[in-house]
């Protein structure tokens, strides 16, 4: 049986950030860690022939400086929720959770985690954009900031920054079940806390190390009770045995705890992924059922066959609309990939 190191048993630190205050703060929180100085994070992160599957059991941490910009226009497979100036930010790369279907496994060459400690430079880059227009920014697409907040403190800093800039709205997306954060942070109506919620079967089979679905639901309720706008993301929907029963039970569990009328909005979408990412994931995970499903290729993106996709999405629309007004339910269709569609009431 393989013996793995514990998570972050090894920390690689770029020489240029060894004296950075955030580097020191992070290292102070880690015990029994081997610290290795490196010239550039890509020397470790971009090495050839890494096994993401193996690294997921013993992730290393890389502390680095981003010098090439961290703010990007939103990708077409991501939901903009009707926001015109939709961007996302990469202040971290990779996630401490290990969801088999996650596109990060296809996008990055490594399973290790990179934290860019020069958050002040990212804020400066964003302020230059904010001087030109209002921005809707997803800050937690390429990592789960909430899950690693105890180590980085980035969530607190993003909330404080957003409160100072009235033309900025951010989304912080998570699968973490932490309830303790939100009552300790001052709420802002432009900081949307988005929880990805899955059926128990999907979470148990594919969302390794992530918080259990009921823990996420409780955390979402804590965020709402603390004054934060909360988005629930039933996205991606994963096809599984008895999917109707699984998703029906999940919806019942969610809305037995959460008042749907108080949600900011809801996201629904079936699994979809770039063909290039899936090709890489299949090579690394040949035994994964979710990765090796016979998807259809639509304009360079893989999705479920039309009969499965439409059945799943229509089922969820009907189930969720019993609790949430349809003008607050969003769904992305790869048929119209440039924009998500806001659902209209079904007559």
Question: What name fits each language-model region?
Answer:
Residues 89-99:
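Cysteine-centered iron-sulfur cluster-binding motifs in ferredoxin-type domains/subunits
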Residues 62-85, 100-196:
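Conserved Radical SAM active-site core
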Residues 216-277, 323-331:
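Conserved C-terminal portion of the radical SAM core fold
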Residues 142-146, 175-177, 196-200, 237, ...:
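Active-site beta-loop-alpha junctions enriched in small/polar residues
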Residues 335-347:
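Single conserved hydrophobic/aromatic residue that forms the stacking wall/gate
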Residues 205-207, 238-243, 263-300, 338:
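Flexible glycine/acidic-rich beta-alpha junction loops that bind and position SAM and/or redox cofactors
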């Amino acid at each position: 049986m393989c013996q793995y190191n514990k998570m972050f048993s090894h920390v690689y630190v770029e020489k240029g950030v060894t004296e950075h205050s955030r580097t020191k703060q992070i290292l102070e929180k880690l015990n029994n860690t081997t610290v290795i100085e490196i010239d550039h994070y890509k020397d470790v992160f971009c090495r050839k022939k890494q096994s993401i599957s193996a690294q997921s059991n013993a992730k290393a941490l890389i502390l680095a400086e981003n010098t090439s910009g961290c703010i990007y226009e939103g990708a077409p497979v991501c939901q903009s929720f009707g926001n015109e100036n939709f961007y996302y930010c990469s202040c971290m790369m990779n996630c401490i959770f290990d969801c088999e279907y996650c596109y990060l496994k296809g996008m990055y060459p490594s399973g290790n985690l990179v934290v860019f400690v020069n958050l002040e430079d990212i804020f400066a880059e964003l302020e230059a954009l904010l001087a030109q227009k209002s921005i809707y920014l997803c800050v937690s697409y390429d990592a789960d900031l909430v899950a690693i907040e105890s180590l980085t403190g980035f969530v607190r800093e993003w909330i404080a920054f957003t409160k100072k800039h009235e033309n900025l709205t951010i989304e912080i997306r998570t699968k973490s079940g932490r309830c303790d954060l939100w009552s300790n942070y001052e709420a802002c109506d432009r900081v949307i806390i988005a929880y990805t919620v899955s059926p128990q079967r999907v979470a148990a089979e594919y969302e390794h190390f992530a918080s259990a679905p009921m823990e996420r639901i409780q955390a979402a309720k804590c965020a709402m009770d603390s004054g934060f706008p909360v988005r629930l993301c039933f996205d991606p929907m994963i096809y599984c045995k008895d999917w109707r029963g699984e998703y029906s039970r999940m919806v019942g569990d969610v809305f037995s705890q959460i008042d749907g009328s108080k949600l900011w909005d809801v996201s629904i979408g079936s699994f979809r992924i770039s063909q290039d990412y899936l090709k890489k994931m299949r090579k690394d995970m040949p035994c994964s059922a979710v990765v090796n499903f016979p998807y259809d290729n639509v304009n360079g993106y893989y999705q479920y066959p039309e009969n499965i996709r439409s059945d799943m999405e229509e089922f969820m629309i009907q189930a969720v609309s019993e609790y949430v007004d349809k003008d607050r339910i969003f769904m992305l269709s790869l048929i119209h990939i440039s924009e998500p569609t806001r659902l209209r009431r079904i007559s």
